[in-house]
Amino acid sequence: MLSRLFQCRRLRFSQRVGRRVLSLLVLMGLPLAAQAEGFDNLSSLADKGFIIGAQAQLLGSGESLGALDPTRRLSPASVTKLYTAAASLDRWGPQHRFTTQLMATGDVDAQGVLHGDLVLDGGGDPALTSENLWRLVQRLRERGVRAVDGQLVVSQWRFGPVTCVTTDRCKARTRSDNAYSALLSSAAVNYGSWCNRVKPGSAVGGEASISDCATVAPLTRLDNEVKTVAHGGDTRLSAERISSESGDTLRVSGQIARDSFSREIYRASSDPAEQTAKTLMALLEQAGIEVESYATSTTPPPTTAKRLAAVDGKPLQELLLRMLNYSNNFMADTLALDLVAKPRAELQDAGDALMRFAQELPGHGVPTLASGSGLTPENRVSARDLNALLAAMYQRSALFPTFVAGLQLPTNGPMHFIRRGSDTFQQQVMLKTGTLNEPVTVRAVAGYFRTQTGRWGSFAVLVNGTSQTPYLAWRQVLPLVAADLTEMIKSR
């Protein structure tokens, strides 16, 4: 009995010494790739050639629970959005709203005719929708405006069109089969994407019906190759937006069952400011306000222009919830561009603003950030950098509730692919993931956790491939991270 008691005490002593040695190594900044204490499962990926940086710590005390090459800077992919969210909260606070306004370059006469241009001043709202534009039009009617003898001008003077720096966005200038590559403008609406609704036709074998989600009448040319099939049939749709000198064309093919509900299709537009102009022109026409033509502009409204109507967007806290939960690239890059003070901002200006914010955080090194979304593969941060960011936001009592609310719990978050690992991991970890497949594989995850005794911790894991490594699915990575974090959570 005494021998067993002695062995237990010796084991506990060895564990305490091991943890102290690990903490000392971390404080000294020594690499821990060879001693992956706390990340034993994750470190197995190194045997397959993947480059890994990881660190987990208790907040408040700063005690390290595990580290694996924590100072190595790697691509974080969409985990970059944590910097965008933090910098936005630091700049504006949770209740900030972006304002979009309609301005007049002339006067409105007694008959309701505006003698001049009607200017939409894009305020950089990352979630401006057709509904917001409809409200602007209704407020314009309330002011008695019935016609404009000039033209509608959509001003994107703050930023836009933003130079593309990633392959997907550069391709989107001519064609797009997705919405995540949407181009950027301070006057963009509906996340820079066309939304069209596909409904079954009136008879089997006939053409399906396609309409704009907001204005009903299509705002682009349509190449409709969707057929209506019998009740109970499969619904399969494929859509691509193609652009030419004459504008955007949406090519939709496939089939939709006669008893199917309508399906919505989102595809990035080739010119977000022009998309806004076309949408607003249609809404003005529906409201009975006559405008003959439209134009887009990169100059501010004249200083003599008068405000006729304005609409405030959703509070920043709601924007961040959507941006982080759904990893919305358009919203993230728009918010990062909003951080730039000068007009005609480009993505690198936004990256510079984020880097300045990051370098002011205690314990943070010098990152490389070329965008706020993480779409740019040049972005580089370390696991220690991310933990410094997470620790700094944890200390900001007025901002932390909004910041952490944007992270997902695997057990009930909107993204189902993270529902892996133990119940402890799924219910006690709040995280943001990042994924890139080109030019190399990136799987990154960072966030917070609660220990068994209720203490808060933070963690960051960066896994980057090389040209020689195989494809890496989340189902291969997340269970390893979950197993390691589960042990840490249970140990405290």
Please describe what each predicted stretch is.
Residues 39-42, 91-364, 483-492:
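Conserved serine DD-peptidase/penicillin-binding transpeptidase domain
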Residues 34-76, 99, 134-143:
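Beta-lactamase-like hydrolase cores
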Residues 51-54, 320, 332, 443-446:
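Short glycine-rich loop/turn motifs
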